[in-house]
């Protein structure tokens, strides 16, 4: 019960409620009543354990299966209903975003298929009065354990969906399928997903949740090379420019709402996170623009400037960030090599890119070794 109470207030802080106090109160009461029911059920089950066990062992197979199927169906329905209530009682636009993510999550679909198929089979067995041998119960126990494993995966997956950093990551990861969106709620085009990311981070900024903002930006930094719209989409330059403008706007909002908050010494790290993210996005954007011009000298000049300024960038004194940047450089090298092999990139341009990127990678690796030696001393 106490666990449900803590979870309730955590959810209240995460979401921007619709303004109707009644909805918020209804949801809180829903969780409170549910926690009381679960608590009472557990107490009653423990007190009457012997009676329940005797009833199960002395009854027929069909009634056992009906009982187990009913219990599993109840648990599944509760999990789905709780997640549905959490999504529906958030703000309208955030509700669309969460629903879009959730119904496309493989773990959610797997849970629905396995859980409700199991319940259907148990009830079907009970209705047909199938008598099983004792050895067959071993299989049934494994099936029940599989369902409880699915419950755990379901809860973990949903916790990720309502966590801003995972929500942002999931939205950006999805492959762009073109500008055929039927509306904001579909989030099927890159522009809609970029705006959804903006809204999620903006809401965290407005409530002063510095920690969540930093986590979102760090997640974007880490997985940037996995976002289709920025790496492989034909309009990636446009999306990179759009995202850079979004980050700039969010940074202004962050300065206004978070930087001068009392008891927030952590807030300055948010500006550092913005700076690091903008650098990564700007690097990808600039190199794509230079390649499009097919100007080898311009490409060399940009990468050489980055090479010469590695020691001057304060952000590269952060070992973790430098490792992320090296990872991005290696991914870019692989990407351009693949494009060259597919005749999408001139070999001459690729060779220049390869030389400059390898030099930059070596420079960063030297910087990493330098930082490691400083830490050891």
Curated annotation (Swiss-Prot):
The keyword Ribosomal protein belongs to this UniProt entry's keyword annotation: no
Organism of this sequence: Methanocaldococcus jannaschii (strain ATCC 43067 / DSM 2661 / JAL-1 / JCM 10045 / NBRC 100440) (Methanococcus jannaschii)
Membrane topology annotation: Multi-pass membrane protein
Name the record gives this protein: Uncharacterized protein MJ0704
Main location (coarse class): membrane
Keywords (A to Z) from UniProt: Cell membrane, Membrane, Transmembrane, Transmembrane helix
TM segment ranges: 26-46, 67-87, 108-128, 135-155
The keyword Membrane is annotated on this UniProt entry: yes
Location of this chain's protein in the cell: Cell membrane
């Amino acid at each position: 019960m106490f666990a449900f109470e803590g979870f309730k207030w955590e959810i209240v802080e995460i979401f921007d409620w619709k303004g109707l106090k009644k909805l918020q109160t209804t949801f809180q009461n829903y969780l409170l009543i549910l926690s009381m029911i679960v608590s009472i059920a557990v107490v009653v089950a423990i007190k009457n354990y012997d009676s329940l066990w005797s009833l199960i062992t002395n009854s027929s197979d069909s009634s056992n299966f009906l009982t187990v199927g009913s219990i599993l169906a109840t648990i599944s329905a509760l999990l789905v209903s709780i997640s549905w209530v959490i999504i529906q009682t958030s703000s309208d636009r955030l509700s669309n975003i969460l629903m879009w993510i959730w119904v496309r999550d493989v773990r959610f679909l797997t849970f629905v298929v396995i859980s409700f198929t199991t319940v259907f089979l148990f009830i079907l067995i009970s209705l047909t009065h199938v008598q099983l041998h004792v050895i067959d119960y071993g299989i049934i126990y494994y099936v029940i354990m599989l369902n409880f494993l699915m419950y755990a995966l379901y809860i973990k997956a949903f916790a990720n969906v309502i966590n801003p950093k995972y929500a942002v990551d999931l939205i950006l990861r999805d492959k762009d399928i073109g500008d055929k969106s039927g509306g904001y709620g579909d989030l099927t085009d890159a522009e809609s997903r970029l705006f959804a990311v903006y809204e999620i981070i903006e809401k965290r900024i407005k409530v002063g949740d510095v920690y969540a903002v930093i986590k979102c930006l760090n997640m974007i930094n880490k997985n940037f090379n996995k976002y289709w719209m920025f790496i492989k989409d034909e309009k990636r330059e446009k999306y990179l420019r759009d995202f850079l403008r979004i980050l700039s706007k969010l940074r202004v909002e962050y300065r206004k709402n978070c930087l001068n908050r009392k008891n927030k010494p952590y807030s300055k790290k948010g500006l550092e996170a913005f700076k690091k993210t903008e650098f990564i996005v700007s690097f990808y954007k600039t190199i794509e623009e230079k390649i499009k011009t097919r100007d080898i000298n311009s490409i060399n000049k940009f990468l050489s400037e980055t090479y010469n300024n590695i020691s001057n960038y304060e952000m590269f004194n952060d070992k973790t960030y430098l490792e992320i940047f090296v990872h991005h450089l290696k991914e870019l090298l692989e990407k351009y090599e693949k494009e060259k092999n597919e005749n999408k990139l001139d070999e001459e341009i690729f060779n220049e890119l390869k030389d400059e990127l390898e030099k930059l990678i070596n420079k960063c690796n030297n910087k990493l070794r330098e930082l490691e030696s400083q830490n050891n001393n």
